[in-house]
C-alpha cells in the first residue's frame, strides 16, 4: 500500500505530473481531478478486459461476448490513445463518454452503473492528450500496482484540506481491520463508505491471511460479488469508491446511493461486520430518520448516535462492529447519549474502547475520537470493557504528521488479541490498558470516557531542606557580588 509503505518514485512522479496538468489547466478541486482520472482509468480498464478476452478467444478458438461492438471500436483506449489532440478530444466528447454512460443499463461492467451522471470536465484537447499519454505511461499490469496507483491518488485528498473528511488515515483503518480479523464468510458493510478505505483494507487482509479462499470458486464468487457493501449520499464518492475497490481486485462491489439512517434503508440483520467512520457533523432532519433508529436513540438527531443504532439494526446476531466515534459519544450527558450507550452495554456486548489522541485526523480535524468495538447479541453479554489509552500512532500529532518512532498500534493489536490472558486481566488502571467491570460503568451513567476510570500516579518528589536551598542562593549572591567588584576595579 502507499500510505505507510513505498511506491516506485518514477510512478509517483508520473502521477504528480498528471495532477499538475489538471492544476495548470484550471481544475484545482482534488475531488474533481480524481473523478476525471477515474473516468479515464475506467475507459482504459474496459479496453484491457477486451484485449484479454480477444487473446483468450484466439487461444481457445471461441468467440465470447464483446464490450465494444463494431460501431464503437473508436471508444477503445488502444485505438484513440494515439489520436492527435483535436481528434481525440472530439472522439471523447461525441463517442467515448456517451458510450461509457450508456453502459449503465448493462452488466458489462460493475462500475458502469455509477457513470450515468458523469460529466467530462477536461477543458482542452491538448490537456486531454497530455493526461491520456500520462496515464498510458503508468505500468498497471497487476492488481497490486493498480491498487497502489489509486491509493496514491486518494492520498491527495488527505492533504487537500476541505476534502480531507473523506479519508480515515490508512494506518488507523489497517489497525481496525486487524483487530476485527475479517473471515472468508463475512459480509462486510461501511454505511458511510467515502472512498471505500475500510473495504479495500479488509480485502487486502483476506488476501494476506486467507490465501486459501482464492482457490475456492464459491469463496471467490462471494469475495467478488456478495462480501462488500458500501453506502453514501455523494455520487462522486460512489464512483471513486467503486473504482477504488475494482482497482484492488474486487470485481463487483455493492456500492449504493443510500441514506443509511433514512427510512428508505430496509436493511436488517444482513451483515456480519461493520467497519466505519461515520459522519459526526451535527444534526439531521428528524423526519428523514428511520423510526426504529429514532426509538433506539431516544429521538436523537445526531448522526454519530444514529449510526451506532443503525449498526445494531443491520447486523446479524453475532455480527461485530468497529467504529470511530467522537469523544462526546462516550461521555455525553443527554438522554440520547445515555440511551445508545445503555442499549449497547445492556443488550449487546461492548468489548473495547480505544481512546485516540486528537491529532490523528490532523491537519484537517483536531477532534478527539475513539474506536468502539462491540458485538450484536440481543441478549446482553457485557461483563467488563477493555480500555486502551492510545497516545501515539507512529506520526507526529501536529499538522505535519511526520513519521515518528512512538507508535502504540502494534501494542494495541497484541493486547486486544490477548485480552483473555491473566496478564491483561490483571493490569492496573495506571497502565496503557485495563478492564472496567460493567457494574462500575452503569454506576457512572454508562460513561465510557477513559479518563473516568484511568488512575494517574503522581510521583512523590523529594526536595532539599529550605535551609540548604537558601544557603545555595546566598553563596551564588556572594559570588555575583565578587564578580561585580572585580569588574568595577578593572573599569
What are these regions (language model features)?
Residues 1-184, 253-265, 355-359, 382-396, ...:
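Non-catalytic, mostly N-terminal accessory regions of nucleic-acid modification and defense proteins
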Residues 33, 37, 233-240, 255, ...:
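Conserved Class I SAM-dependent methyltransferase catalytic core
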Residues 47, 195, 235-236, 262, ...:
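Conserved nucleotide-binding/hydrolysis micro-motifs of P-loop NTPases
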Residues 162-276, 281-283, 292, 305-306, ...:
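Conserved S-adenosyl-L-methionine
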Residues 226, 258, 290-296, 356-357, ...:
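Short beta-alpha connecting loops at secondary-structure transitions
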Residues 283-300, 304, 342-344, 392, ...:
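Accessory, often C-terminal, charged low-complexity segments
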Residues 349-350, 362-412:
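C-terminal, active-site-flanking charged/polar segments
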Amino acid at each position: 500500500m502507499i500510505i505507510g509503505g513505498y511506491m516506485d518514485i518514477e510512478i509517483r512522479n508520473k502521477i504528480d505530473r498528471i495532477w499538475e496538468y489538471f492544476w495548470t489547466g484550471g481544475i484545482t478541486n482534488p475531488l474533481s481531478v480524481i473523478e476525471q482520472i477515474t473516468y479515464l482509468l475506467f475507459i482504459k480498464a474496459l479496453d484491457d478486459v477486451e484485449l484479454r478476452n480477444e487473446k483468450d478467444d484466439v487461444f481457445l478458438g471461441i468467440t465470447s461476448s464483446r464490450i465494444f461492438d463494431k460501431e464503437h471500436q473508436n471508444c477503445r483506449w488502444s485505438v484513440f490513445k494515439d489520436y492527435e489532440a483535436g481528434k481525440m478530444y472530439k472522439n471523447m466528447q461525441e463517442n467515448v463518454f456517451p458510450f461509457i454512460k450508456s453502459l449503465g443499463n448493462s452488466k458489462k461492467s460493475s462500475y458502469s452503473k455509477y457513470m450515468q451522471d458523469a460529466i467530462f470536465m477536461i477543458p482542452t484537447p491538448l490537456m486531454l492528450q497530455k493526461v491520456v499519454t500520462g496515464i498510458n505511461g503508468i505500468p498497471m499490469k497487476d492488481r497490486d500496482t493498480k491498487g497502489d496507483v489509486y491509493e496514491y491518488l486518494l492520498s491527495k485528498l488527505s492533504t487537500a484540506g476541505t476534502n480531507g473528511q473523506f479519508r480515515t488515515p490508512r494506518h488507523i483503518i489497517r489497525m481496525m481491520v486487524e483487530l476485527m480479523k475479517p473471515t472468508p464468510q463475512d459480509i462486510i458493510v461501511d454505511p458511510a463508505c467515502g472512498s471505500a478505505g475500510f473495504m479495500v483494507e479488509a480485502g487486502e487482509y483476506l488476501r494476506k491471511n486467507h490465501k486459501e479462499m482464492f482457490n475456492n470458486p464459491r469463496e471467490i464468487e462471494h469475495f467478488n460479488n456478495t462480501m462488500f457493501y458500501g453506502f453514501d449520499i455523494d455520487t462522486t464518492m460512489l464512483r471513486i469508491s467503486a473504482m477504488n475497490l475494482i482497482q484492488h481486485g474486487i470485481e463487483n462491489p455493492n456500492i449504493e446511493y443510500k441514506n443509511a439512517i433514512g427510512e428508505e434503508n430496509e436493511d436488517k440483520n444482513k451483515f456480519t461486520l461493520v467497519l466505519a467512520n461515520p459522519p459526526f457533523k451535527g444534526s439531521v432532519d428528524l423526519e428523514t430518520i428511520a423510526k426504529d433508529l429514532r426509538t433506539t436513540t431516544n429521538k436523537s438527531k445526531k448522526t454519530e448516535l444514529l449510526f451506532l443504532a443503525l449498526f445494531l439494526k443491520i447486523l446479524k446476531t453475532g455480527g461485530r462492529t468497529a467504529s470511530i466515534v467522537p469523544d462526546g459519544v462516550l461521555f455525553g450527558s443527554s438522554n440520547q447519549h445515555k440511551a445508545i450507550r445503555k442499549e449497547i452495554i445492556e443488550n449487546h456486548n461492548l468489548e473495547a474502547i480505544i481512546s485516540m489522541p486528537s491529532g490523528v485526523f490532523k491537519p484537517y480535524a483536531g477532534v478527539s475520537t475513539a474506536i468502539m468495538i462491540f458485538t450484536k447479541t440481543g441478549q446482553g453479554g457485557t461483563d467488563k470493557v477493555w480500555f486502551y489509552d492510545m497516545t501515539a500512532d507512529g506520526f507526529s500529532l501536529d499538522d505535519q504528521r511526520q513519521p515518528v518512532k512512538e507508535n502504540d498500534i502494534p501494542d494495541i493489536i497484541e493486547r486486544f488479541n490477548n485480552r483473555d490472558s491473566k496478564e491483561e486481566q490483571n493490569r492496573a488502571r495506571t497502565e496503557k490498558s485495563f478492564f472496567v467491570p460493567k457494574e462500575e460503568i452503569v454506576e457512572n451513567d454508562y460513561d465510557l470516557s477513559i479518563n473516568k476510570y484511568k488512575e494517574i500516579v503522581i510521583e512523590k518528589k523529594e526536595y532539599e531542606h529550605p535551609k540548604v536551598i537558601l544557603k545555595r542562593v546566598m553563596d551564588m549572591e556572594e559570588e555575583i557580588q565578587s564578580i561585580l567588584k572585580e569588574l568595577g576595579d578593572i573599569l
